[in-house]
């Protein structure tokens, strides 16, 4: 097909889509031009059905450094492993796409988005999400889209579509919402303690933009799209299901209601193993060249159906319990939260620590404070260096679920959970001026049965308070679930692992008693209604307040003092023009200051803020006083205790006609003989010598910065 171009506008910027010219061997490909941002989106699917029990979809978002006119760092000078931004954006695009494939589809699909040109004012993330949907829509891949995304901010009570970075700095909402023309199926948000009503309004505002982009894609599909292939779906064989249920179904159903997670899974696994072993004894034969041989394909199909049937029995029972009996596998009511237990100050040498336990999910939180030069450097497409002073890292070791497994670099899930917790707590942190520290929170998941990301938020909040970080308010998180049964539905508070796996929604809400600070929603169905979302938000608010009440019994106020092992920081402000006086040629002066003041750490910002760090407050104060003395500026009319440094002689070198006096380190002025005393004098011989301390007044500072002093006006 020949190249075709489709144009519209998005948030006041031109949006152009080109198809049919680049990457023609992919199933679907589109070039997205948004402002000066250019993204190539491609979609490819394997023709052969995969032998997996899940849908193998891989979404990749890759930022090329050349897109911003930059050469990559590092020894090899080329792009390496995905950055955190790339990983999170890949997940962001994956989440609204995945529900729009048939449940039994098992072909491997890869959607790749490559940022070729980067415009800071035109979001490459939104362009990539749109491009991913278009690439799938115009391909033969059986995708039930289209979907689109919208970035929403709110400034002075007014919603803004696709806000710029400057607008986001003053916005109280940072929301990305995605979905189809009919429903929302993904939400990712950070907010400054906004109400549930405001958040819902923001989501609906974003959905209006989504509807327009979906209509735009329908136009492209009609003009360029190809016929979809009929998917080869993994479907349930009812006869085999009935046979499996007759053999061990009742035992499996009973095991679902065991309260203890480990016991429940152990019993379920044992029953499944017994069923598999039973059906493994069955063989199938076929005739080849007059001989009876084993039919391996038919045997493999049988065992696949047995495993699918076992999973279906568990799924049906979990959903039946909730929708019909209104009780959950562990016996809780639909809005009931698991038992809570917490403590602080577990680790004596850390700067702050806490433990949060909710049912069989447990998180250990640790806070570390450092100097601002320990901020994380973000090496992205921005032209200026971007740093981050608050970091939250989430670790999920295999032992937390009683398993062995891989240890190493964090995966996509760990990075995503850490980012959600970071976003939730960031909203309540003090400003850099109020608390001039780099802050790192680490959440070690020590037990897990669902909602570990929300346990991370709770334990992080308590650990920050225990560390003496003056947060605006405590933050708690809760994960909500949903079971749809036709037109009827059940909303669950504080979902556990089995409910997450078998349910239709994972809706995570974090916030303070006054409002939401973070929101994340993923669903497995094609979308949910506004009414369901509204009800889930209100149920989450009640659950959040319950958890906050518990946390308040453990630690109700931020500690007034930092740990004895935490570094102390003092901030002073100096005239930016005086920074060179503190640093000196080749760093000579600042190096000497550090050596003379017990190896303090000193960070100087371009705006004149100076951060001094040491474990001993006395050295902080001494260093601050010394730096302030270096950069002090004389003021006309001020009195100073000055030290005579030089004598001013007459032209014959016989009589003292004045003195030079240092009013503070680095600044001296002239006291002429006429300004020495009220009575007229011919010479200062015998009246003053080098080293004398005299009281002087600044009477004039000329345009060259020279200071005239008067002794007589100070008397």
From Swiss-Prot:
Assigned EC number: 2.7.7.8
Keywords, in A-Z order: Cytoplasm, Magnesium, Metal-binding, Nucleotidyltransferase, RNA-binding, Transferase
Compartments reported by the entry: Cytoplasm
Residues binding Mg(2+): 500, 506
Homology family: Belongs to the polyribonucleotide nucleotidyltransferase family.
Protein name (database record): Polyribonucleotide nucleotidyltransferase
Catalytic activity, as annotated: RNA(n+1) + phosphate = RNA(n) + a ribonucleoside 5'-diphosphate
Signal peptide coordinates: none
GO process annotations (BP): mRNA catabolic process; RNA processing
SUPFAM superfamilies assigned: Eukaryotic type KH-domain (KH-domain type I), Nucleic acid-binding proteins, Polynucleotide phosphorylase/guanosine pentaphosphate synthase (PNPase/GPSI), domain 3, Ribonuclease PH domain 2-like, Ribosomal protein S5 domain 2-like
Domain (KH): residue spans on this chain: 567-634
GO CC annotations on file: cytosol
Domain of life assignment: Bacteria
Cofactors, names only: Mg(2+)
Main location, first listed in the record: cytoplasm
All residue ranges annotated as the S1 motif domain in the record: 637-712
Single GO term (MF): polyribonucleotide nucleotidyltransferase activity
Function, in words: Involved in mRNA degradation. Catalyzes the phosphorolysis of single-stranded polyribonucleotides processively in the 3'- to 5'-direction.
Pfam families reported in the protein's UniProt record: KH_1, PNPase, RNase_PH, RNase_PH_C, S1
InterPro entries per record: ExoRNase_PH_dom1, ExoRNase_PH_dom2, ExoRNase_PH_dom2_sf, KH_dom, KH_dom_type_1, KH_dom_type_1_sf, NA-bd_OB-fold, PNPase
